Regions:
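N-terminal Rossmann NAD(P)H-binding glycine-rich loop of SDR-like oxidoreductase domains
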Residues: 2-30
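SDR active-site strand-loop-helix element
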Residues: 13, 44, 71-75, 115-121, ...
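Adenosine-cofactor binding site in Rossmann-like domains, unifying the SAM/SAH pocket
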Residues: 39-61
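Catalytic helix-loop patch of NAD(P)-dependent Rossmann-fold dehydrogenases
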Residues: 88-95, 99-100, 123-176, 180-182
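NAD(P)-dependent short-chain dehydrogenase/reductase
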Residues: 130, 161-218, 224-225
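Mid/C-terminal beta-alpha module of Rossmann-like enzyme folds, strongest
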Residues: 229-230, 235-290
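Conserved C-terminal active-site "lid" loop/helix of NAD(P)H-dependent oxidoreductases
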Residues: 252-260, 281-320, 324-330
Length: 331
């Protein structure tokens, strides 16, 4: 006799954001499959007006809803420049990145719900675990943290808040750190911003040069890849802290290497000539800003696939939409 899989009801916070949108829609598709372990899926976006940085906001919602087996927190304030330089940005970063995860965790525990919390490589920097870094290693979940900007510091506080809230139920939460996340549901992702820069350069710059930093290193990760990591937590009942990033052949990837890989991949796509990328040249530069110069993490969860393959799959799947995006902004 075959037993049906137990269905998990899942709450997705931030379902209108770049990651949350893809997580929510992927789970909805899975919930329709008979052999899936995904049950009812509910998404909460900005339009719900739920103030997650207030202690009881989520708890009140959960008390008046169905029981959720899992809550996936995709909410974050990711504008690192505003978090560093603007008063309102600093407040929003602290509220959404530091306070909200703690209160979300407390609400989930009250309703006996497991939490999957998304965090960042920015909890690390070139100042983290100095000996380990000097030896050329990538960061592991147990590596020393040392954020160098407000965003990273707030995200680390959020991690601590989640872990402390679950201290009596350590198998009830998973923290997935990811890095340089890209997806289609955000025109401010690196890929979209880079392509905007390319279009502008083709129109206005006779040298057709696009400047890219070579003194930042991390690992580009697609929303599709991160979703596989999230599903792995649910399917295998994993708990603790994981680094949800693809593999790399070297110790991290620079923005310059990332941009070159985007160009090379798009040039190999069908109809690539339509978007005129062949004349673009990348100019290496070194910039100093409020970001870690090295925050590359080693993969500890998800498919053992390299970042270049993940990028190629993403760009091939979304080539038409990206070409349309470039055509639209070129007008």
């Amino acid at each position: 006799m075959l037993f049906k899989k137990r269905k998990h009801n899942i709450l997705v916070l931030g379902s209108d954001g770049m990651l949350g949108y893809d997580v929510y829609n992927t789970l909805l598709q899975l919930s329709a499959a008979e052999d899936s372990n995904v049950g009812i899926v509910i998404g909460i976006g900005k339009e719900a007006g739920l103030k997650l940085h207030e202690r009881n906001a989520l708890s009140h919602f959960m008390a008046n809803s169905i029981h959720f087996d899992y809550c996936i927190n995709c909410v974050a304030f990711t504008d690192t420049n505003r978090a560093e330089n603007e008063d309102i940005g600093k407040i929003l970063s602290y509220q959404l990145n530091a306070l909200a995860p703690k209160y979300i965790a407390e609400s989930c525990i009250l309703h006996h719900t497991k939490l999957i919390h998304i965090s960042t490589d920015y909890v690390f920097s070139e100042l983290s675990d100095a000996v380990h870094h000097r030896l050329g290693g990538m960061f592991m979940p147990y590596s020393e943290t040392f954020p160098v900007n407000a965003y990273g510091k707030d995200k680390l506080l959020g991690e601590i808040g989640v872990a402390n809230a679950y201290h009596k139920w350590p198998k009830g939460y998973a923290i997935l750190r990811t890095s340089w996340l890209y997806g289609m549901h955000n025109s401010k992702s690196f890929i979209h911003k880079f392509l905007k820069n390319v279009v502008s350069t083709l129109k206005d710059n006779k040298t057709h040069e696009v400047s890219m930093t070579e003194n930042e290193k991390s690992v580009p990760t697609s929303t599709y890849y991160l979703i596989k990591c999230i599903l792995s937590v649910i399917d295998d009942k994993k708990y603790g802290t994981f680094h949800a990033v693809p593999l790399t052949n070297s110790y991290g990837v620079t923005r310059l290497q990332y941009a070159k890989a985007i160009l090379d991949s798009l040039k190999s796509c069908k109809n690539a000539n339509e978007i005129g990328l062949s004349d673009i040249k990348l100019k290496p530069v070194k910039l100093k800003g409020h970001w870690p110069e090295f925050s590359a993490m080693a993969n500890t969860i998800g498919p053992c696939r390299y970042w270049e393959l993940e990028l190629n799959l993403f760009l091939n799947k979304n080539f038409d939409a990206l070409a349309e995006f470039m055509t639209m902004i070129a007008k």
